[in-house]
Each structure stands twice: as structure tokens, then as C-alpha cells.
From Swiss-Prot:
Keyword rRNA-binding: yes
Assembly notes: Part of the 30S ribosomal subunit. Interacts with proteins S7 and S18. Binds to IF-3.
Function: Located on the platform of the 30S subunit, it bridges several disparate RNA helices of the 16S rRNA. Forms part of the Shine-Dalgarno cleft in the 70S ribosome.
Name of the protein: Small ribosomal subunit protein uS11
Gene3D superfamilies, alphabetized: Ribosomal protein S11 (3.30.420.80)
Gene name of this polypeptide: rpsK
GO CC annotation: ribonucleoprotein complex; ribosome
UniProt organism field: Phytoplasma australiense
């Protein structure tokens, strides 16, 4: 008889304060909530919610991803968050608004988008 695999159950941590990292690209939006040390508590993305193709890059998809993360974070006892936004995508404002509407108190919003000091050549711009 085969042995049953023992899996770790998700432990409910009591974390009152956290950091929300919103990473928006032109193709997707990823929202991760960490504790003050940077250990991930929960995450979600537009693709993980079932959006495919060009629908992943919409503000609505970013909104739903942020809502899912906020609900999971509040189950861990989180009430206040600091928001770090990175990337040029369309879901930036929608994700922040959604976190606030879900009931999390936002203490600070910081843009941490990496700006090159003339590093790599960017992709060619679409002509239309």
C-alpha cells in the first residue's frame, strides 16, 4: 500500500501590517502581499484568475487580482498596508483602488519602477 503524502497546511499568521507589491506590465498584473521582512503571505495575478491573452492586461483584471489578495491578507489579520508599484501597465491605479475598497488601510504609496540609466535598447515601438 502506498504511503499518503503529508502536505503542510497553510498556517494562519497574525500579521497586522504588510507591504503590497504591485507589478504591472503591458501583458499582466501581479499583486503580492508580504510582511515587513519581505516574506510573501499571499499573491495573485490576472493570469492566475483565469484571464487569458489581452484580457490579462486590463484594469478590470488587475482589480480582481488585488481584491483576491486583499481578502486573503485580511484572513491573516492584516489591516494596514504600504503599497509599492512597479511597471508601466494599465492596472496600476485600478489595483490600488481595489485594495483600498476591500477594506485595507493604505499608509503610503511608492513608485519603485526601475528606470535605466540608458541601459538596454527598448523594444521597437508599434506603428499604427
Amino acid at each position: 500500500m502506498a504511503r499518503r503524502k503529508t502536505t503542510k497546511r497553510k498556517v494562519k499568521k497574525n500579521v497586522p501590517f504588510g507591504i503590497a507589491h504591485i507589478h504591472t506590465t503591458f501583458n499582466n498584473t501581479i499583486v503580492t502581499i508580504t510582511d515587513a521582512n519581505g516574506n510573501a503571505i499571499t499573491w495573485s495575478s490576472a493570469g492566475a484568475l483565469g484571464f487569458k491573452g489581452s484580457r490579462k492586461s486590463t484594469p478590470f483584471a488587475a482589480q480582481l487580482a488585488a481584491e483576491a489578495v486583499a481578502k486573503a491578507a485580511m484572513e491573516h489579520g492584516m489591516a494596514k498596508i504600504e503599497v509599492f508599484i512597479a511597471g508601466p501597465g494599465p492596472g496600476r491605479e485600478a489595483a490600488v483602488r481595489s485594495l483600498q475598497a476591500a477594506g485595507l488601510e493604505i499608509t503610503a504609496i511608492k513608485d519603485v519602477t526601475a528606470v535605466p540609466h540608458n541601459g538596454c535598447r527598448p523594444p521597437k515601438s508599434p506603428r499604427g
